[in-house]
Regions:
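Gly/serine-rich nucleotide phosphate-binding loop at the start of the catalytic core
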Residues: 1-67
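Positively charged, low-complexity nucleic-acid-binding target-recognition regions
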Residues: 13, 160, 285-287, 291-404
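Acidic carboxylate diad motif detector
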Residues: 45-147, 286, 290
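A short acidic-Thr-Gly-centered motif at the start of a beta-strand
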Residues: 150-169, 330, 335-338
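Phosphate-interacting basic helix/loop segments used at nucleotide- and nucleic-acid interfaces
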Residues: 153-164, 237-259
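Gly/Thr-rich phosphate-binding beta-strand-loop-beta motif of the actin/hexokinase/Hsp70
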Residues: 165-185, 300, 348
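Metal-dependent catalytic core segments for phosphate chemistry
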Residues: 179-230
Length: 404
């Protein structure tokens, strides 16, 4: 299994030169690909483009040059799939020239020296990129790109799923907006409060609207216009980081709690396609399209696998409407689910219970009587889910700088 780490590198002349060379190569690959299409009606393959343009590129490792062509053709292939499926309205193929582009290094160009310095080769006769490395693990792949204010390194490294699940329990998880996750294991239940995430989304929308109104009143390209655009990018980037931090901390807390409670299988409601064909009004649509359920579920999945747990997805159809006790269906009103059979329970926990039951089979034991109140988990900005040693390592990752 591969994980990704990120390092902030600042801005250096060497990284500017590398990004410029990668941008020039991207522009060359794109220009000649579309020239062949327009003049000869022929689509170059990735291998043909690499033979034509990626050999002996000055200042770039051969595999870094090949990775630029890979990126172009991956983007092109993605567009062609969208076109073939008919779902490509407003999408255009990659054709624009790029002044700068991300630089990628594959395993053969990466070396971790004994003195703790990561060496990224740029080919024979060129100065390598040297970075103080806060880990004794060599990454399999490294990518350096511009994030709007500085260069950021992203690396992939292999980790072993060496932890075994402590038990064989099955947990059902219902993903929501007011409650980011409702979890039911049959014995225990929790709800993870999502109101802080909603607050950050509102702040994000207000900030974007406020700055957009100021930007629209300035002359395009003027000094004041540029400053406002930079301020918008900076402020929205900070909010995006806060949202990602919240999702990481909640998902880590959730998975560790399940591992401690001897859960071996995690069943998550599949919300794929939930946005398709829905129209609840402008504000509700905005909340729905900003709902980060996909990213949150992906975090749960890979963190659960690291703890040896199996993750499954099942459809969520009618899981919030079906009574866990008698099986009758009706739409609940408010946050409590009340059935005519006498069953009462938290609305989101009813969904989590039915997701779990759907995976285990319809003949599993039904919930009788009243469902116990769940344990609530609320986000705090200072909440930490890792031990002190891990926090120290995380700080080291954030503080890395290039050598020299």
């Amino acid at each position: 299994m591969y994980l990704t780490r990120k390092l902030k590198l600042g801005k250096t002349d060497q990284l500017d030169r590398l990004a410029r060379r990668a941008g020039n190569l991207w522009s060359t690959v794109a220009k000649w690909h579309w020239r062949f299409v327009d003049r000869q009606g022929y689509w170059l393959s990735k291998g043909q483009a690499q033979k034509m343009h990626c050999k002996g590129v000055d200042g770039l490792h051969s595999q870094s040059a090949q990775a630029v062509a890979d990126s172009f053709y991956d983007s092109l292939q993605s567009w062609r799939k969208k076109r073939d499926s008919g779902d490509y309205e407003g999408l255009r193929p990659p054709y624009k020239q790029k002044r700068y582009f991300k630089v990628q290094w594959k395993s053969a160009a990466i070396k971790l020296r004994d003195d703790g310095v990561l060496r990224l080769s740029n080919g024979r006769g060129n100065d390598p990129v040297l970075i103080d490395w806060p880990s004794d693990t060599k990454p399999k792949r490294v990518e350096i790109g511009w994030d709007g204010s500085q260069y950021k390194l992203r690396c992939q490294y292999e980790v072993e799923e060496d932890q075994e699940p402590k038990g064989t329990k099955t947990a059902g998880i219902d993903i929501g907006e007011i409650h980011l996750a409702a979890v039911y294991t049959g014995d225990d239940s929790w709800t993870f409060n999502g109101r802080e995430l909603r607050s950050l989304r509102r702040q994000q929308n207000r900030t974007a609207a406020r700055l957009d109104s100021k930007i629209d009143r300035k002359e395009y390209g003027s000094r004041r216009w540029k400053r406002l655009v930079q301020a918008k990018d900076r402020q929205l980037g900070k909010i995006r980081s806060q949202i990602k931090d919240l999702l990481h901390k909640h998902s880590t807390r959730l998975v560790k709690t399940l591992h401690e409670r001897r859960v071996g299988t995690v069943v998550v409601g599949d919300l794929t396609g939930i946005r398709n064909g829905l129209d609840y009004g402008s504000k509700a649509n905005q909340r729905l399209h900003q709902w980060a359920y996909g990213e949150f579920v992906r975090m749960i999945e890979y963190k659960a696998r690291l703890h040896g747990m199996t993750v499954k997805r099942v459809g969520e159809a009618y899981t919030s409407q079906e009574c866990p006790s008698c099986g009758n269906r009706h739409k609940p009103h408010g946050r409590e689910y009340i059935c005519s059979c006498g069953f009462e329970g938290h609305r989101d926990l009813v969904g989590a219970s039915n997701i779990r039951k759907k995976y285990l089979g319809q003949d599993s034991v039904r919930v009788a009587g009243e469902m116990a109140s769940p344990t609530g988990v609320r986000y705090r900005p200072h909440m930490r889910c890792n031990p002190a040693s891990s926090r120290k390592a995380a700080c080291q990752w954030q503080g890395c700088r290039p050598v020299g």
